[in-house]
Structures are given as C-alpha cells and as structure tokens.
Amino acid sequence: MSLDIDQIALHQLIKRDEQTLDVVLRDSLLPTNAVVEEMMAELHRVYSAKSKAYGLFNEQSELADALKRSRKGDEDFLSFSRAATGRLRDELAKYPFAEGGVVLFCQYRYLAVEYLLISVLSSCHSMRVNEQLDLSTTHYLDINRADIVARIDLTEWETNPESTRYLTFLKGRVGRKVSDFFMDFLSAAEGLDTKAQNRGLLQAVDDYCADAELGKNERQAYRQQVYSYCNEQLQAGEEIALQALAQELPKLGEKNFQQFSAEQGYALEESFPADRGTLRQLTKFAGSGGGLSINFDALLLDERIFWDAATDTLTIKGTPPNLRDQLQRRAGSK
C-alpha cells in the first residue's frame, strides 16, 4: 500500500465520571516507524471500505481556519492537533453518550492525494499469553470497529474549495447519531447526497428505457447492464462515471444515456460514489415490515410473482423448496 505519513499526533480523552472528560495531550508528534505505518494502513483500509457521507466546512468553521493556518505554516501541526482536541473535548462533553478514547490526527498521502484523517479510537481489553505461557492482560486500539472518523481530502479542498465532497465521515449508530457531535466539532454540513444521486440514476435509466419504448425483457436486460457496470465500480472502490457508463451501454435512439440524462435535468454529477442498497433495486425487489421480509429477482415479476395494486396483494406461484418444506412440516404438525 502506497501510503506516506507526513505528520501524526495522538492525544487522549479520559472519562473520569459522568460529568468529567479530561484531556491528555502529547508534547511531541508521534515518530513514524513500522508500527505506526502498519496502524495507519489498517485504519485507511477499514475507513475506505465503509459507507461514508460527504460534507463541507461551514463558513465559520474554527477547525477549517486553524487547518488553513497550519497548512500555510503559521501554526505547527502539533499545536493544531492539541487545540483541536480541546475543542473536541468541549463538544463531546455536551452529549450523554460521551466516552473517552485516543484522538488521532494524521496527515498522509495516498495515490498522489493528500488527506487529513481525524478519529477517536476506543481501546479494548483482552488477554495474551507470553513466551513462558503466562497469562496477562493487554489492551489494543479497536480499529476495525472505529465509527468516529472523518477525513478531509486536502488536495480537493485546496484546489476546488466549492466542492461539496472533500470531507467524508462515517454515519453513527441507531438513534442519536454519534456523527452529530463530530460534525459540530468540525463545524461542517452534509454535502453530496450519494443516495439521491443513485436514486436519480435509477430514475434516469427507467425513463431512458421508457422513452425508447423497450419491452419488459429488454428493459430488464438494460438495467442489468447498468448494474453490472456500477457493481464493478463498487467492487473496485471507484465511482460511477456517467460518460464511462454511457459508453458501456447501447445507444437507444438519437441520444446516448449521458446526453439523455443531461437534457432531462436529473442533476447527476459527472461522477459519484455507488450506493449498494440503492443499486440493488436495478435487479431485485426487496422490502420488509410487519414480520414479513421479501426479496426476489425483478425478472420474476409478472412471471411467477404477481402484484395486484387494487388489493395490494402479492401472489407467488411456486415456493422455494426449503420454504415449502417448512410449510409442509408445519401443516403436518397441526
């Protein structure tokens, strides 16, 4: 992995009691060695694999102003990280779920892009066996389950300040979002809505097929082609590019897919991240609620599965063998 660490700082937040959250600040940057490089490579890998939301700094963001000063050399990186940790402590202390953790600031470069990653990492306790087969306690950073993480694409931020996607962060847990306090700390707002972009793509595909008056099987084959391209991009960690997608798809009528979507005003970006759950709707129908969960291939609609809109009734002809076996056993036990 071609990841080059420029500067990295660690500090700590310690929860003393329900009302007190203390901060412990390092007096120096963390030396870059093999252990640090391995940790950052793992954190980068874990973060890159997770679904993220996009954002941008508010005009009055203190963190953005401090980061600009640091980038210009008016303030060193350690001072920037120490002051930011203090602001994070003040923000986090407002929330009832406040917990301590190791606060990490790392400026690094990956594939010619410069990033600043900020995270609060939890420590977990475990057991270890030494060479003498004695048992002792140990603790480690729980990187795989890190959920308080934000990353700023410094290259994008500085070259394209009008962008709505140079800041990414992880969505929080169910209920009051853990990400709320982190967004307040960053003084940032949500930017590019990836789900909306993917929904817009699906609508554009359906309208394009309808405009070309494709039959049912032709429409589904076209959706499958769109899904195949998008899924390949998703698996490769790449974005959906409308121009590349249009080149993959057969042209319907006088306009290709990109020209059609631009003229119809779907407000799609030239490229945007793929959303797995939304894209699945190209090839499947799925839903759950009221103790019922249904998932089936789109090709089965009006073939083996029929929906009566007037009565909101779904009729299934031919059940899966394992389901049929369960139903037969239950019927036989009555």
From Swiss-Prot:
Keywords carried by this UniProt record: Cytoplasm
Subcellular location: Cytoplasm, Nucleoid
GO molecular function terms listed in the Swiss-Prot or TrEMBL record: double-stranded DNA binding; single-stranded RNA binding
InterPro entries the record matches: Nucleoid_associated_NdpA
GO cellular component terms, A-Z: bacterial nucleoid; cytoplasm
Source taxon at top rank: Bacteria
Family: Belongs to the YejK family.
The name this protein goes by in its record: Nucleoid-associated protein YPK_2796
